[in-house]
Curated annotation (Swiss-Prot):
This is Small ribosomal subunit protein bS18. SUPFAM superfamilies: Ribosomal protein S18. Belongs to the bacterial ribosomal protein bS18 family. Gene3D superfamilies: Ribosomal protein S18. Binds as a heterodimer with protein bS6 to the central domain of the 16S rRNA, where it helps stabilize the platform of the 30S subunit. Part of the 30S ribosomal subunit. Forms a tight heterodimer with protein bS6.
């Protein structure tokens, strides 16, 4: 039988960074913004991790993919060895 978890910790509410900073257009040339949504291995972080809304996540994903094709962002991270 599963036991109920008691006490624990309160989760931090994730805030949509794009909506909070009133960013209208997610531009593929703005690599500093896009790097917030990429893991250290170069993978696009999911909504449940970043806290972005579905609409803004689509904008971010499209901008990241465009930036990768234009060689502004890497497809994969460099090997650390």
């Amino acid at each position: 039988m599963a036991q109920q978890r008691r006490g624990g910790f309160k989760r931090r509410k994730k805030v949509d960074f794009i909506a909070a900073n009133k960013i209208e257009v997610v531009d593929y040339k703005d690599t500093e913004l896009l790097k917030r949504f990429i893991s250290e291995r170069g993978k696009i972080l999911p909504r449940r991790v970043t806290g972005t809304s579905a609409k803004n996540q689509r904008k971010v994903v499209n901008a990241i993919k465009r930036a990768r094709v234009m060689a502004l962002l890497p497809f994969v991270a460099e090997d650390q060895n």
